[in-house]
Amino acid sequence: MNTLVQLKAGQLAGIQRLDLSCGLTEFPREIFELADSLEILNLSGNALSSLPDDLHRLPHLRVLFCSDNAFTELPACLGQCAKLSMIGFKANRIRHVPAAALPPLLRWLILTDNCISQLPDELGERPLLQKLMLAGNHLAHLPPSLANCHNLELIRIASNRLTGLPDWLLALPSLTWLAYAGNPVEMAADVAADDATPDIPWSALELAEVLGEGASGVIRKALWQPSAKPVAVKLYKGSITSDGSPLHEMQACIAAGLHPNLIKVEGRVVGHPDDQAALVMDLIEPSYRNLAALPSLASCTRDIYEPATRFSLAVALRMARGIASVGAHLHRHGITHGDLYGHNILWNAAGDCLLGDFGAASFHATADTVETRALQRIEVRAFGVLLGELLQRIDVGLSDTTRQILEGLQARCCQPEVLARPGFEEVEALLQSIPQH
C-alpha cells in the first residue's frame, strides 16, 4: 500500500500501480503526475463519490478499482479512458450506470453489491466483455444487447430480482461460468436433503487453528466431541460476495449430497452464540493441494498453473473422470456448480480430486427441459476448458490416438452451439472408455 505522503512528496514517480486507501474524500490531483507510467489504480476503501472529468489524462490506465467507496453513479469519465479494460466498483451505493461510463475496451466489469436496477443497452456494444459481476443488485432484467457479447465467459447475477433467464443468455457461445442463485427464477433447493442433514451443537466443537479464509467464510480445524474426531468447520459470513450469498452456498453444499469427489458434509452447526451459520465437514488430508491458482488481472477468466505442474496420462484421466462424474452427480440433483475451475479442485499425486467452493452454485429443474439442458451444457464448457488445461500438462503416456480422442472431446465440450455439447454422463462414459496406458 502506498501513502498519500509519498504521492504528494513526488516519491512515486514511474510506478505502474498505485494503491491508496486512506479515507480520501476527493481524488488527489497529484496522481496525474504519474500519467507517464500509471497502469493500475486502486482507490478502494476510501470515501470517494466522484472522479475527475479529465481522468483520461492517465493514458496508460488499464485497471481501476474503486470498491468500498460512496459512489452513487458509475462515473461517466471512465468511458473516455482509451485503454481502460477492467473496472471494479463493488460495495458502493451505485444506482445509475450511464452508457458514457463504459470504455471501448471494457473486458471485466465488477458492480457487485450496489443498488442497480437497470443497465444501459450500450453494454452489449463492448465486444471484448469477458467477465461481468453483478451479484447483489436490484436487476429484474438484463439488456438483450448482451447477446452480442460473444466473448462473455463469466456472469454473476446472483441475489437480484430476475424472474427468468433469457434465451439469449443461455445461448451465448462462450458463456462458461454462470451464477444466478437468490433470484425468483431459481428453483427451490431439495428440502429432503436439508432435512436429512444432522444438527451438530456448537458446544460439541473445540475450535483450533484457521485452515483458510475466502470471501464467503472462514474454515477452521476442530475436534468434534465426544469422540474428538478431527473435522473442518466452515463459518459463513453474511455479506454478499462476488458470487452471491454465502447462505446459498451453504444450502448447495447440503443439497449436493454424497459423492467420492465432494467434501463430505457431516452436519449443520446449531447453537452458535452469534447465530452464525456454519457447517461441519470432513477434514481433508494434507496430501491434497489446489490444482491451480486464481486468474490474474491479465488472464481474466483463466486459472494460473505453476510452471512445473505436469501429470501422467493416468493421473490426468483420473482427475478428468472424477470431475465429470461429480458434474453429472450435481446436475442430476438440479445443481450447477457455477465455478468449475482448477482453483476450486484439490488433488493429490494419485489423481484423487475433490471439487469444492459452492459459492456460485445455483439450483435448476431436474426435468429434461431446454433450459435445464442449456444450463448444464454451459457448465460442460467449463469442463472443456479444464480438460484442455490438463491436456497441455500431460508429459507421460499420451499416445497420438488418445490425444486425438481427448482433443476431440474438448472441442465438443467447448463448441459455440450450446445444446450440441455433450452432457456430463456422456463425457464420463467416453473418459471411462479410454485406456490409461
Regions inferred by a protein language model and the residue ranges of each:
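ATP-binding glycine-rich loop module of kinase domains
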Residues: 216-252
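Short beta-strand micro-motifs within the conserved protein kinase catalytic domain, predominantly
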Residues: 264-277
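C-lobe/activation-segment region of protein kinase-like
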Residues: 354, 359-410
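Catalytic-loop of the protein kinase fold
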Residues: 327, 331-347
